[in-house]
């Protein structure tokens, strides 16, 4: 598990990416719920 990118740990990249993906999905669900994403 020592094979990292050198500067940023791989688990940190995975965690941040997961949070961004979940936030983006939640944002799209919120937009479609409030009617802002109904035109997409």
Swiss-Prot record:
Transmembrane region(s): 8-28
Bilayer topology term: Single-pass membrane protein
Major subcellular site: plastid
Family per similarity comment: Belongs to the PsbJ family.
PANTHER family: PHOTOSYSTEM II REACTION CENTER PROTEIN J
GO biological process: photosynthesis
Superkingdom of the source species: Eukaryota
Quaternary structure annotation from Swiss-Prot or TrEMBL: PSII is composed of 1 copy each of membrane proteins PsbA, PsbB, PsbC, PsbD, PsbE, PsbF, PsbH, PsbI, PsbJ, PsbK, PsbL, PsbM, PsbT, PsbX, PsbY, PsbZ, Psb30/Ycf12, at least 3 peripheral proteins of the oxygen-evolving complex and a large number of cofactors. It forms dimeric complexes.
Function summary: One of the components of the core complex of photosystem II (PSII). PSII is a light-driven water:plastoquinone oxidoreductase that uses light energy to abstract electrons from H(2)O, generating O(2) and a proton gradient subsequently used for ATP formation. It consists of a core antenna complex that captures photons, and an electron transfer chain that converts photonic excitation into a charge separation.
Pfam families: PsbJ (PF01788)
Protein name, per record: Photosystem II reaction center protein J
Organism: Zea mays
Keywords: Chloroplast, Membrane, Photosynthesis, Photosystem II, Plastid, Reaction center, Thylakoid, Transmembrane, Transmembrane helix
GO cellular component: chloroplast thylakoid membrane; photosystem II; photosystem II reaction center
Compartment list: Plastid, Chloroplast thylakoid membrane
This protein's encoding gene: psbJ
């Amino acid at each position: 598990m020592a094979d990292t990118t050198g500067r940023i740990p791989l688990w940190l990249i995975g965690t941040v990416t997961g949070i961004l993906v979940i936030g983006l999905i939640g944002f799209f669900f919120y937009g479609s719920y409030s009617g802002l994403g109904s035109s997409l």
